[in-house]
Design a protein with these regions (language model features):
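Hydrophobic alpha-helical segments
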Residues: 1-219
Length: 219
């Protein structure tokens, strides 16, 4: 209802500000941290539409898949922010206390999101995630450097390595995300197919059909 419309309006407003932000970046009139925060805010408003949509879903399989996808996308977004913040610190050759805390927050925030996804996702998507999407040893080593000490000056070599490793992980996460989207669409199409006879009968029968119990899931 009105809450969903408000979420959509906020997201549209944030999207409308992207050209001005890109122009500032092109003219180097905005700090990297501020630009990253603005991009993250746009994505956050887009993602926040999902909980409002979920409030209108009465079918448990569809609701579960929606929450699994939403949780996964939240985790994936935090991985993207981790990539950006780490690349910034390694490029500069130092991590300020503020930048380091932001990085730690993004790393710590990923696990609850992915735990929620694994509790609700299909066995196939969960297995794919566990097989290829965890941060590998190379990423963990660079995380320790970023979070505990200052990196050595190497002309940006570590920054490129960090960015490449995180990009590879994001591509693997995208593969799982696409499967989650397919799962949600399949469940939705199945629900529509099952409900079609009921819609036709409803034109001749004014009785109220019992509604499915809604599973309340934290987002």
């Amino acid at each position: 209802g009105s809450a969903l419309c408000w979420r959509i309006a906020r997201a549209v407003d944030e999207l409308a500000q992207l050209p001005a932000l890109r122009a500032q970046i092109g003219r180097r009139q905005i700090a990297a941290e501020a630009a990253t925060e603005q991009f993250s805010r746009v994505i956050r408003h887009l993602l926040n539409i999902a909980p409002q949509l979920n409030d209108s879903i009465d079918d448990p399989p569809v609701a579960g898949r929606m929450v699994a996808l939403y949780s996964f996308m939240q985790g994936k977004e935090l991985v993207g922010q981790e990539r950006a913040l780490g690349a910034l610190g390694f490029t500069r050759g130092e991590f300020s206390d503020s930048l380091r805390q932001q990085l730690v927050d993004r790393i710590d925030g990923q696990q609850p999101c992915f735990d929620s996804f694994q509790a609700l996702g299909s066995p196939a998507t969960v297995q794919l995630f566990r097989t290829q999407c965890h941060a590998g040893l190379d990423i963990e080593q660079l995380r320790r450097i970023a979070c505990t000490r200052q990196p050595a000056a190497d002309g940006g070599e570590t920054a490129l390595r960090w960015f490449g490793l995180q990009t590879q992980r994001l591509e693997q996460l995208r593969e799982v995300e696409e499967q989650l989207i397919d799962d949600l669409l399949d469940a939705t199409y199945a629900l529509l197919a099952d409900d079609a006879p009921g819609w036709q009968a409803g034109e001749e029968d004014d009785s109220v059909m019992p509604r499915l119990d809604k599973q309340l899931l934290p987002l």
